[in-house]
Regions:
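Structural detector for internal amphipathic alpha-helices that build alpha-solenoid repeat scaffolds
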Residues: 1-8, 24-38, 47, 54-70, ...
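HEAT/HEAT-like alpha-solenoid repeats
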Residues: 12-19, 23, 43-50, 74-81, ...
Length: 346
């Protein structure tokens, strides 16, 4: 008998396969029906959610999420309590795909009570629900488990909802550094100016990673109030923070930062020097005069990065000074000047 290949026949063939005595055949059927996204399969897949084989149940949970029929929500909520962890995770993932409000409390419970893998899965699912989940997440910010607070902060940041801003600002003072770090990231994602002063304060946090994320958040919010505190933070003892500060000052593009950034061209860490040079490039033409002057700086690093940056800005005023720099006693400066002159000609 010739194999049937039209869509209707494929659907019927795979629906029949769900009744096969072989678990692998039933599993393949759930995968095929999920890929078809045909709502006629929902009833059969709901039955497969109760299959004796855990792989088939997991496949059915996945397929129901792919099809996207809201009638599957109650059964998937029930499957969150399945005895097999992978079935539970599959159900949580599909509830996230369906983004139904009825799933909020089961997903919150999965976030709170699951192992690391389940918590991560529930976190991703909650991200899909958007604004309806915010109130529940705000409650989790005071949970006794720092990991729960951390995940709630992460999801709230991803929603970009300004309603979360004030509670997230409070988490900048959390006893756990991972939560403080996540709060800084989240506030940067939301980009609300009410977070500027608290983030400036976070530049003094005892943990370097919190300070670094505060620089990134301030860069995303782009408020001029942060320029002076960021300049001060260019002297932070941790190079990662200094690098973050340089990037932030580049985003803010304030000429006030030109001199401090030029000094940072002599930082002991190359990444910071590169960040400072890139920031000066972002500031652009207002930085040209100072960069030209610093082609005579005692530090070879400053001369080298000044030449490099002048090439990136492409201001013809720098040409004759770069030609002179070709005679610099440092070969690195000579090379940077040569490259910069080539860029000026482009």
């Amino acid at each position: 008998m010739p194999r049937r290949t039209d869509k209707t026949s494929d659907f019927e063939r795979w629906s029949e396969a769900l009744l096969s005595p072989e678990w692998e055949t039933r599993l393949n059927a759930t995968e095929a029906l999920g890929k078809m996204k045909d709502k006629r399969a929902v009833k059969s897949l709901l039955a497969a959610l109760k299959d004796e084989d855990e792989y088939v149940r997991e496949g059915a949970a996945w397929a129901l999420g792919q099809i996207g029929d809201q009638s599957a929500v109650p059964a998937l909520i029930a499957a969150v309590k399945d005895k097999d962890k992978y079935v539970r995770e599959g159900a949580v993932t599909s509830l996230g795909d369906l983004a139904n409000k009825r799933a909020i409390k089961p997903l919150i419970q999965a976030l709170k009570s699951g192992d690391e893998s389940m918590r991560r899965t529930a976190e991703k699912a909650l991200l899909n629900l958007g604004e309806p989940v915010i109130e529940e997440l705000l409650l989790l910010l005071k949970d006794s488990d720092w990991d729960i607070r951390w995940r709630a902060v992460h999801v709230l940041g991803a929603t970009k909802n300004k309603k979360a801003c004030e509670p997230l600002i409070a988490r900048l003072g959390d006893e756990n550094r991972y939560v403080r770090e996540a709060a800084a990231i989240a506030l940067g994602e939301i980009e609300d100016k009410s977070a500027v002063e608290p983030l400036i304060k976070a530049l003094q946090d005892e943990n370097k990673y919190v300070r670094e994320e505060a620089t990134t958040a301030l860069a995303e919010i782009r408020d001029k109030r942060s320029v002076s505190p960021l300049i001060k933070a260019l002297h932070d003892k941790d190079w990662g923070v200094r690098w973050g500060v340089a990037n932030a000052l580049g985003e803010l593009e304030d000429p006030i930062a030109i001199d401090p950034l030029i000094k940072a061209l002599d930082d002991e860490v190359r990444y910071v020097r590169e960040g400072a040079a890139s920031a000066l490039q972002r500031i652009g033409k207002p930085a040209v005069k100072k960069l030209i002057e610093n082609l005579q700086d005692p530090s070879a690093n400053v001369r080298r990065w000044s030449a490099w940056t002048l090439g990136k800005i492409k201001d013809q005023r720098a040409a004759k000074y770069l030609i002179n720099a070709l005679q610099d006693k440092d070969s690195g400066v000579q090379f940077a000047a040569e490259v910069a002159l080539t860029e000026l000609e482009e």
